[in-house]
Amino acid sequence: MRFLPLLACGAICVSGQDPYAVAGDHYHLIFENPWARASRVTYGPHETAPVHEHPPTPTAIYIYVTDGGEFRFKHMTGLPIAGLVITRPAVKAGAIRFSHSAPETHSVEYLGDAPTEYVRIELRTRPLDLPIRDVRIPARALDPGKSAVLNEFENGQIRILRVVCAPGKKCPASQNPDDPAIVTVMTGPQRGLVRWSPAREKGPLEEVRVELKSEPAEPRK
């Protein structure tokens, strides 16, 4: 990413707001519960979003449903990037990022020439065995005719799996059925659909399955 100093911000710096309220055309709440909050994020070519705030959760996962161009984030608050402009590089559909999360207040400018969509999952579970740096998983070409499960990353908090469901066949069952899961559909007419621990679908289909290994950081009521 490229970093540039943000020289001035004025009164807007202290007025972070709910993204679903101030940027509802771009941020779409799918669900939230004690384990996670999942959002669908969509931008058209060269669209912008006003200053908004993301909450302080320990970690977050980004699943890129489509290709996407560069984004420019102007950060007003947040550690350790207060006062910086960050340019996120272009991404490929199927790429995944598992990141350390922090409270952020920023505006957004999408620099791409084609629409883009990704899923943002803010994890509320205990952040066990955190990697030192963000985990970036590149897109992968998979054989749609053969059911398969690929373990892309695992630590004490999560397990990130790519799942291929062959035509007419149910998606492979989880080897850890007691772990709740967040499933994102990556192909077909339901591409971009996100579900909490859904029943097994039938192929042809590709999914990203995030299985949650640790308990919510805050006690469930």
State the predicted function of each range.
Residues 16-51, 73-172, 204-221:
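A short, N-terminal "cap"/entry segment at the start of jelly-roll beta-barrel domains
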Residues 56-78, 173-192:
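Glycine- and acidic-residue-biased ligand/ion/polar-headgroup-sensing regions
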Residues 53-56, 112, 175-177, 201:
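Short glycine/proline-enriched turns and hinge-like loops at secondary-structure junctions
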Residues 7, 97-98, 183, 188:
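Alpha-helix C-terminal capping segments
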Residues 101-107, 189-201:
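Low-complexity, intrinsically disordered Gly/Pro/Thr-rich segments
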Residues 3-13:
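Sec-dependent N-terminal signal peptides
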Residues 65-68, 113-114, 156, 187-189, ...:
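Short, solvent-exposed coil/turn segments at beta-strand boundaries
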